[in-house]
Amino acid sequence: MNPRRKKRLTLAVALIGGVAAITSLLLYALNSNLNLFYTPSEIVHGKTDTGVKPEIGQRIRVGGMVTVGSMVRDPKSLHVQFAVHDSLGGEVLVTYDDLLPDLFREGQGIVAQGVLSADGKLEATEVLAKHDENYMPPEVAEAMGQKHEKLDYSQQKAPDTK
C-alpha cells in the first residue's frame, strides 16, 4: 500500500471512530438525563401498549392523586411518605425529604420526580402540586382520562336571590 493511500485510510478510520465515540457519548448523556412519565398503574403493571415497567434505580416522574389518609410525617424531620393513585387503581408509595409545596393536600393531583427503589417506592427529589382547583398537569389529565375544556361563561345575568 502506498503512503498516500495509507494516510487516507488512517484518516477515514480515525474520523469514523471519532464520530462513533461522539455519538455514543451523546446517547449516553441523553439517556441518563431522560425522565419518563408514568402513572401509578403503569409502574405496577407496566405500560399498556408495551408492558414495559420502569427499572429499579431509573429516574422517573409519576403523576396522580394523593390518596386521602396515606400521608405519614416524621415529627423529628422533614421526611414524609404518601401514596399516589390513579383512576385505574394503581398506587405507588412516595417518600420525600424536603418541604412540600404549599398547595400540597391529600386528594389533589401532584407530579413527583425521583428514583424508583427496589421496594417499589419512589424516592422523590421534587414534588409539584397543582395550581388551583381546576388545573391538572396535561400528562396527569391525559393519563387519568380527564379532558380539559374551557369554561363557557354566558352573558346572562345571575338571577336575583332576594
UniProtKB/Swiss-Prot annotation:
<comment type="similarity">
    <text>Belongs to the CcmE/CycJ family.</text>
</comment>
<feature type="transmembrane region" description="Helical; Signal-anchor for type II membrane protein">
    <location>
        <begin position="9"/>
        <end position="29"/>
    </location>
</feature>
<keyword id="KW-0812">Transmembrane</keyword>
<dbReference type="GO" id="GO:0017004">
    <property type="term" value="P:cytochrome complex assembly"/>
</dbReference>
<keyword id="KW-0479">Metal-binding</keyword>
<dbReference type="InterPro" id="IPR036127">
    <property type="entry name" value="CcmE-like_sf"/>
</dbReference>
<feature type="binding site" description="covalent">
    <location>
        <position position="131"/>
    </location>
    <ligand>
        <name>heme</name>
    </ligand>
</feature>
<feature type="binding site" description="axial binding residue">
    <location>
        <position position="135"/>
    </location>
    <ligand>
        <name>heme</name>
    </ligand>
</feature>
<dbReference type="GO" id="GO:0020037">
    <property type="term" value="F:heme binding"/>
</dbReference>
<feature type="topological domain" description="Periplasmic">
    <location>
        <begin position="30"/>
        <end position="162"/>
    </location>
</feature>
<keyword id="KW-1003">Cell membrane</keyword>
<comment type="function">
    <text>Heme chaperone required for the biogenesis of c-type cytochromes. Transiently binds heme delivered by CcmC and transfers the heme to apo-cytochromes in a process facilitated by CcmF and CcmH.</text>
</comment>
<keyword id="KW-0408">Iron</keyword>
<dbReference type="GO" id="GO:0046872">
    <property type="term" value="F:metal ion binding"/>
</dbReference>
<protein>
    <recommendedName>
        <fullName>Cytochrome c-type biogenesis protein CcmE</fullName>
    </recommendedName>
</protein>
<feature type="region of interest" description="Disordered">
    <location>
        <begin position="142"/>
        <end position="162"/>
    </location>
</feature>
<dbReference type="Pfam" id="PF03100">
    <property type="entry name" value="CcmE"/>
</dbReference>
<dbReference type="InterPro" id="IPR004329">
    <property type="entry name" value="CcmE"/>
</dbReference>
<dbReference type="GO" id="GO:0005886">
    <property type="term" value="C:plasma membrane"/>
</dbReference>
<feature type="topological domain" description="Cytoplasmic">
    <location>
        <begin position="1"/>
        <end position="8"/>
    </location>
</feature>
<keyword id="KW-0997">Cell inner membrane</keyword>
<feature type="compositionally biased region" description="Polar residues">
    <location>
        <begin position="153"/>
        <end position="162"/>
    </location>
</feature>
<keyword id="KW-0472">Membrane</keyword>
<keyword id="KW-0349">Heme</keyword>
<keyword id="KW-0201">Cytochrome c-type biogenesis</keyword>
<keyword id="KW-1133">Transmembrane helix</keyword>
<keyword id="KW-0735">Signal-anchor</keyword>
<dbReference type="InterPro" id="IPR012340">
    <property type="entry name" value="NA-bd_OB-fold"/>
</dbReference>
